[in-house]
Swiss-Prot record:
List of residues binding FAD: 14-19, 126, 181, 370
Organism, scientific name: Exiguobacterium sibiricum (strain DSM 17290 / CCUG 55495 / CIP 109462 / JCM 13490 / 255-15)
GO CC annotation: cytosol
Gene that this sequence comes from: mnmG
Residues the entry annotates as binding NAD(+): 273-287
Record protein name field: tRNA uridine 5-carboxymethylaminomethyl modification enzyme MnmG
Protein function: NAD-binding protein involved in the addition of a carboxymethylaminomethyl (cmnm) group at the wobble position (U34) of certain tRNAs, forming tRNA-cmnm(5)s(2)U34.
Amino acid sequence: MAYQAGEFDVIVIGAGHAGIEASLAAARMGSKTVMLTMNPDMVGFMYCNPSIGGPAKGIVVREIDALGGEMARAIDATYIQMKMLNTSKGPAVRALRAQADKFEYQNRMKKALEDEPNLLLRQALVERLIIEDDTCVGVVTNTGAEYRAKAVIITTGTFMRGKIIIGELSYESGPNNQMPSVNLSKHLEELGFELARFKTGTPPRIDGKTIDYSKTEIQPGDAVALPFSHETTQMITEQIPCWLTYTTEYTHQLIDANLHRSPMFSGMIKGTGPRYCPSIEDKVVRFSDKPRHQIFLEPEGRDTEEVYVQGLSTSLPEDVQHDILRSIPGLEKSEMMRPGYAIEYDAVVPTQLWPTLETKRIAGLFTAGQINGTSGYEEAAGQGIMAGINAALKVQERDPLILSRSQGYIGVMIDDLVTKGTNEPYRLLTSRAEYRLLLRHDNADLRLSDIGYDLGLINETRHAKLAEKKEDIQREMKRLEKVVIKATSEVNERLTEIGVSPLKEALHAITLLKRPEITYAMIADMTPPPVALSEEAAEQVEIQVKYAGYIDKQLDQVERMMRMEKKRIPERLDYDVISGLAIEAKQKLNQVRPLSIGQASRISGVNPSDISILLVYIEQGQYALTAE
């Protein structure tokens, strides 16, 4: 029996990593928000690896924090290990990675949702949308409840028509044997949305008491842990190590002997899997020359014995998984607590979205997270906060927020998805960002916190601290340009001690800092600033001085790109009447509907000659539009 369950500004379907950020962003911006989830006990649950961050992903977490999101604060409060990656490399690729206490993380996120006054968390299974005049105005649940809203965000993760596969066994299910969402997926197809079928997988979990750690290598966290969030002031001191072991020749023989039972190779799995997170059977087949593969043993929390076997993602039968585990050093007597599995699910083809993550087909309907074809908690959360922000802005009749490729990895990801699409689960990589020296872990707040403040997601205190940090950096940069360091015996003696050629003449401090061996701490010791800089400000000064040439070069590239972005394309431009455009270009342009010449130039299949023709056509000022 249908009944009216309430009116809201924003409805969010799903309570995973995308749904959490979407709900909190919309609510904190003043929109009355309801989050509908099949199981409120599984809010923010980590169905796959118990970790947050890593290359590119860790930078996304910092960006979410800079915009006022929750993920960074939650992991800072619940990690069991923190590590800065790529410290021996340049600043563009450094990123934090945390091992999470997945149960504490989940509880922390549920509390954040419950504590938000503008947000209601409610159990419900959404089966269809309410569409009026090509606009989404609400949802209907399996109990007949009708929720009305001005914007709806779908963040259903891998639940849509989910199917778990373990060897010859397959059954309809969401991840971790949760109930799947079947009717909503069918409903989206009925509405005309094109869906893709993707697959992901997870490894077995084992009982930590049955591991012989003496046969593995300890992997400790950093002695001095750094936070993800700029608001975190106190770090957890007691960390728990991970452990490293390897597959063996016998492991590979077991896998080869059972490939006929692997759903990946038998044709049972139809969905496309993630390129950068292959199953162990896929690795053994594709890299047959490798004698072994790394296996990381990752504790799932402080109060559980379950250990996640990173690197052993598999959908082989349960009995084969048991034998594989016991072929690995340290795991000879291990007991499996949960088997690994593959899960197939439906995803929306993301070229059907505007850069705001609103669907082109139905106004007021947004999608975010794995439903858009991405993989990973961080990618999902990054989309979630943007969908939540843009849904709230739409409700408030304000201009949308679109992050450019030069503003953040979140901008890179969304542009890739809506412009190029993806034929496999999309993972963020530093190599996807052409301006990665500008999109560093250390400057996320400088790039994005002003935006968060303008949206009302960053408070006055934090914004004032950011303004002070900016002033400190600029003041110190100017001071270093003026201060002269003389070639005294004391200075040269210190330079010689660290293997640097002595000065023959006086140098400006900024010039000396450009030398690779010289740190800002050394300069500050030789010529102390009037007021000591914070560690974060000092780091910025050093990076901005040492990489000034490269940064300036990328800023020039950004300026050229922005000129193309400013050349807007009418939303309903009729590409079919433009003579000279290649047939493939017309097809792709009609599909993506780019908003600018810059975006059009990034579409696969649209060549420079097509862009030139398009530019000339638009600049004439007279162009044909399609009917609405």
